[in-house]
Amino acid sequence: MEYTVNSFSEHHAKLNTQINAGDAPDVFWVNPEYMRDFVDRDQLMDLTDLMDKKGVDVSDYLPSSLEKMQYVGEDGDTHIYGVDCCIVGPVIFYNKDLFDEAGVEYIPTKKEDQWTWDEFVENMKKLTKVEDGKTVQYGTSNFEEKFSLYTTLELLGSNGAKWFNGDYTQAVGIDSEATRDTLTKIKELRTVYGVAPNPTAVGVDTSHSPTQMFMTGQVASIFVGSYALQELSQSGINLGAGLPPKMAEGTKPIGSANLDCIWKDTKHPEEAFELVQYLTSVDVCSDVYKTGLWMPNRVSLYKEENQDKWYNPEVYPQGWLDMTWLWTEASLRPFDHLRNTDEIYDTCTVYMEDYFYNDGNLDSILPEWQEEVNALLEE
């Protein structure tokens, strides 16, 4: 078996080129936001019959994982074109020592104790330190995250902003009051309350990236995908983890992760599917789950009697098991069933940065933003 590695920035374009040239690998991973384009181009093998033939219990996949794997064809039937191995989604990691110094209670891990947005802001104020007119410690960071990741999208959904219709063919809620309210609150963390750093000031200095600022004590907490735990658990920080704050009725978590797919024209379909089964098996993935990089994507693994297959108390912060609903109840990340996703990402970045950093007006930005995304979805 030959194994090749691509950089993420060129991976999907290179795959498309290889497939068009008839020289693609038999098995490859695809980030879910690119799946619809590969499916629409008829480049992936339909795994539905093989899954059934091999007795794969698809009902054991978490709802968001199964939705990500399934596509409704022109025949109206559901088809599976890729298999995932995990789920990730955003949580708030924090430095317990900095919370103790400020006399701030730890961020709740139980749903019934979850902070409201206002409670979160007030506590982040207590964690922010200013010396001689300069902020030397911020309360939190990474809420202004790019749309290809998680935090901004989760807050939008939690505040009731439903950006797309049911089959992800039309943008319906970019220009909405929920979007206005969410983006305003995120920006105010930095511009009104001063509890978050300006990410545009980072430049190429990676020592001031959100993660590095957190690990060096310049920020007390960071809102980021759960995958960050693998790195943060090795940082030496007295690490805690808690629920994101509620914006409206409560958090509506999102989750995602890449899928393993098979080239439609592979000469070895049975062997390729056997490899996909191996790569996505619990036996293989459990070792990665225990590092904190991934969370399990199977319903059965969250049952108490199976938690020892993934839960590592030396890695996962106290209270983590209270938060597993963030993954078991997660919805699919809304960008994961779009077409022309790269172009949509670029458009979203332009409009979001115009508002966050150029004092753009949401009343004029959001209608244009929605119109441009719809034009891309119609291409």
Task: Show the residue positions of the predicted features.
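Extracytoplasmic/periplasmic solute-binding protein
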Residues: 72-86, 90-92, 100, 116-172, ...
